[in-house]
Amino acid sequence: MGKLTLLLLAILVWLQYSLWFGKNGIHDYSRVNDDVAAQQATNAKLKARNDQLFAEIDDLNGGQEALEERARNELSMTKPGETFYRLVPDASKRAQTAGQNNR
């Protein structure tokens, strides 16, 4: 019985080593799970960005309002007959704002 017990103990030790440290063991499993979680988080961010871009494309294809708003905000364009006014804060307010931002 001593040899059989020793053999079974050796097999148990080998199986435990394979489970914890071997290829496709617990360490590899946890690393892959972490990689999967990180990839799923990245995919969720990219999906949200794609959804936002698709909504913007639909707005631009669907109507003139979105196109007009974008032209006004990003390119400072105006319609014929309109006057563009830019409001610039006075120098004392700009100095106060700059002083607060430097703190």
Curated annotation (Swiss-Prot):
Main location per the UniProt record: membrane
Top-level taxon in the UniProt lineage: Bacteria
Topology of the protein relative to the lipid bilayer: Single-pass type II membrane protein
NCBIfam families in the record: PRK00888.1
Compartment(s) of residence: Cell inner membrane
Annotated protein name in UniProt: Cell division protein FtsB
Gene coding for it: ftsB
Oligomeric and partner information: Part of a complex composed of FtsB, FtsL and FtsQ.
